[in-house]
Amino acid sequence: MASLINVSSLVNRVKLDQSIIGSDEINKLYGSDAPLVFKDEVKMVIPGNAEGEAIKLQANILTADRLQSIRNAKVNGKEAAYLHLGFVPIAIRSLLPSGNEQIWGRCALVDTSRTRAETAVIDEFEFKFTKKQPFAAKLLTINAAVDINCKVSVGSIQVLLELHGVDLREERSVAAIITGLTCTPTNKMVLLHKIECDTPKWSLCNIIEQVEDEEESKKAFENMFNASSSNLIDLGQEQWLDEGKRTPLIGSLAIKGFGRKVMPVRRRNLTTRNLMKDYVSHVKSETASLKRSQSGRDWGNDRLRKYLEEQALEQARSSTDHQLVKAPKFKTIEVTGLETVHDLKDKIDKAESSTASDTGTK
């Protein structure tokens, strides 16, 4: 299977922070069906924490509006019955200038609609950065058709990440993860004829092929899955990559202006900084466990969720460290970037109290 793609070409795209699924290597695997393939990615910048706990993250790939666009696509003039799920790239890159050789982690591609880890895990692997290569990447294959009209069948395919070895005095951005999915509306059960029903995997860089303690690793992956959520919110700024590409006319020969166009890569860029993911989960992220009294759950779930969703939407539009967040029925609240749940609660309480005084209500 290694001969199917040029691995060094994909590794080079990882080094340049380019899209793996936007590569010609992926287009070649689809052959004549390449122009029908939808390509989606999500890029997340994730924070470390001052407590030194493991960083945990979960993310979905396809948004609800994107899925609807895919459903609307016709196949030879007919509505598609299936959505073929193809390739999933996962690339993790350090955003730290030093100490990268101490960073390692676990990653899993799972189906969160299942109840047991052994049936849910599509693939799992461990990785370790090096001083010369502070990044890791792997290309996975799902190669399965699901019901295109079933939201759960598509939305339950998610990535789980656990990062270790990050020590900080204060919270800061420590890493970026890019994952994606190629999918094709179809009325056929087999689409990738070069691999038939096989599911090859390509370790691109710094993937640990043999773990030291398999039982401990298995238990850790089970814990990751058991802690996952099936209810994530779609957010992020949209970006289009690898536009204007065409399929080769003869063999690998691509002539500018000729050949059928292939679709560009749709990427969502987002950050997990400053978001309480128990309530706002466009990604679900944890940097330390909170006691129940600290978690904000005693403080009106609906109210906290509503406010934090507004905060997340505003944060997705801005990359500054100092911003204004507006919530319905609340006065403008200043968020500086270091608030705890209690800080947010106090600010909202004061804003509500002030609003009530202005209107003569309680």
UniProtKB/Swiss-Prot annotation:
One Pfam family recorded for the sequence: MP
Keywords, in A-Z order: Host-virus interaction, Inhibition of host innate immune response by virus, Suppressor of RNA silencing, Transport, Viral immunoevasion, Viral movement protein
UniProt keyword Transport present: yes
Protein's UniProt keywords contain Transport: yes
Gene Ontology biological process terms, A to Z: symbiont-mediated suppression of host innate immune response; transport of virus in host, cell to cell
Signal peptide start-end: none
InterPro entries, A to Z: Viral_movement
Function as written in the Swiss-Prot or TrEMBL entry: Suppressor of viral-induced RNA silencing.
Protein's name according to its UniProt entry: Putative movement protein
Species per Swiss-Prot/TrEMBL record: Citrus leaf blotch virus (isolate Nagami kumquat/France/SRA-153/1984) (CLBV)
